[in-house]
Amino acid sequence: ILNDANDPMGVEKEAIDSVWLGCNGVIYLTNRVYSPTSYVSVSYPAMINETMHILYWGIKQLQYNVYLNSLNSYYSFFIPTNNSLLEYVDPVSYGKSQTQLYRFHYDPTQVDENMRVWASVWNYDTVAGEVTDSIGEVRDPGRIRNRLKDILDTHIVIGNVEDGHKYYRTKGGMEIRVNNVADGANGMTVEGSYQINEGNPIN
């Protein structure tokens, strides 16, 4: 028996009380509850937490739940909150004369789910570290998905960051350094190349 991620559910014969044949499948009555994979996967906090709606929208739009829900693989997932996505320096703008910063927003009132996430765009002074002029908005779902894909790919590690090493490679190929894992929220730090160069780890 496979679950909604097409992984074996691990249902033992002893757990099956009754079986019915339907016109399009089989119904098993079990004497225990099996959780949907989305409730036990690494993306679960983003699904239920209102402060993480933006990233969960990206997970659904990009269909990342297909493999994040897989119980045959192990992932470490660092989930940015909505507030942290107000300071995303657009890597596409690095080749421009003016670096730009995206501030992502979530609008739950939008009937069209594809339009619920949008971004205001600002000029950003990389030397002073200051946000300057507002230069417009991005409401094209394709561009928003593109930027969120970059964020997701740099926040997913295939493997366990609690295995005793310090350096890991993200799904997007970026190297990160993880320290003080055993301290959890009280002291664990994560650094990409920018944080390492600036001596400013994220905790």
Please place each PLM-identified region on the residue numbering.
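Mature, structured domains of secreted/extracytosolic soluble proteins
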Residues: 1-203
